[in-house]
Amino acid sequence: MPDLKTMMLNFGPQHPAAHGVLRLVLEMDGEVIERADPHIGLLHRGTEKLIEHKTYLQALPYFDRLDYVSPMSQEHAYSLCVEKLLQCEVPIRAKYLRVLFCELTRILNHLLNVSSQALDVGAMTPLLWLFEEREKILEFYERASGARFHAAYIRPGGIAADVPEDLIEDIAKFIEQFPKYIDDVDELLTENRIWKQRTVGISEISIKQALDWGFSGPMLRAAGLAWDLRKSQPYEIYDQLDFDIPIGQNGDCYDRYLVRMAEIRQSISLVKQCIEKMPEGQIKTEDRKISPPSRAEMKKSMEALIHHFKLYSEGYHVPEGEAYAVVEAPKGEFGVYIVSDGTNRPYRCRIRAPGFAHLQALDFMAKGHMLADVAAIIGSLDIVFGEIDR
């Protein structure tokens, strides 16, 4: 009897469930996947090299364009890294506003993931409901920074500008009525028979396997390990806030969905706490080598105007050394490593994207599953190619 040959199938990069520009070469035995080979690099823009040719402030907007569905988390990691090199202390109000917007960013990210994962397996309604809520959060982004996506709001030394007076009030109102929309999606999906058939038991992964592959964030927590940098290595003011770490049991697509839904609820609680505890005060460091003089000062003093111009054209010089900062981004641990040679530009910047580690395990996770399950698996990984290809 002749040997049966496996079939090669190209999934993407134009496929709607590829979540961007993923080209997946599948080796298939009938409908069953023998091997899945992700081809990356179609969105490579050389970000790390571009950063070497920019000042520390000019490099910041590149981070918005990595994981472009949760931009402020990336800015946060970069700002913390530069602040480590500068040994700069950030005012307490700026810390609260940073955490407030990072948690809104987490909600923004998980809303997109849950709705698009549901769409990938055929549930259209959550996308229509949740995009309306995302739009409201993007409006808060716009009112704070002037941009819906590429905010450049969290900067080394603090934040770009204080929030408008009524914005905190509007966020509080939104957070009050928002949980009912999450309850609606919960009701629609969590116990839905078809949803469970498509996600329960698909690409199960143990804690050991997750750690071996370098998983972090919801991917690791869904496997059952309560590892969250906001608790285990607290940064900013997370040690003063009260929240739980949701974990899964089986590490399958269904558990990843449950963990993200629970994280949305935890983020709602964190946003409420930030609003309640929000102090008054400065939003930028007083160190004039890093933050510019105020507009009022520039109108009165020629030196202040020159100082402002030099700070934005030439940039500040960062002491020689190296630093690594990592934050609990919505997709996992997002790290930035910077080497400074004492000039106004980074000598080297290395970005640790969580999605890269998750995508490399796709072959391991998809093996033995059906072709139809690939969409469910990719949806549960929560990958964005801006950060994977960099």
Curated annotation (Swiss-Prot):
Q: Where is it localised?
A: Cell membrane
Domain of life of the organism encoding this protein: Bacteria
Keywords (alphabetical) are: Cell membrane, Membrane, NAD, Quinone, Translocase, Transport, Ubiquinone
What is the first-listed, main subcellular location in coarse terms? membrane
- First-tier enzyme category under EC: translocase
Catalysed reactions listed for this entry: a quinone + NADH + 5 H(+)(in) = a quinol + NAD(+) + 4 H(+)(out)
The enzyme's E.C. designation: 7.1.1.-
Which family does the entry's similarity section mention? Belongs to the complex I 49 kDa subunit family.
This protein's assembly is summarised as: NDH-1 is composed of 14 different subunits. Subunits NuoB, C, D, E, F, and G constitute the peripheral sector of the complex.
Q: What does this protein do?
A: NDH-1 shuttles electrons from NADH, via FMN and iron-sulfur (Fe-S) centers, to quinones in the respiratory chain. The immediate electron acceptor for the enzyme in this species is believed to be ubiquinone. Couples the redox reaction to proton translocation (for every two electrons transferred, four hydrogen ions are translocated across the cytoplasmic membrane), and thus conserves the redox energy in a proton gradient.
State the protein's name: NADH-quinone oxidoreductase subunit D
Native source organism of the sequence: Wolbachia pipientis wMel
Could you read off the lineage of the organism from its UniProt record?
Bacteria, Pseudomonadati, Pseudomonadota, Alphaproteobacteria, Rickettsiales
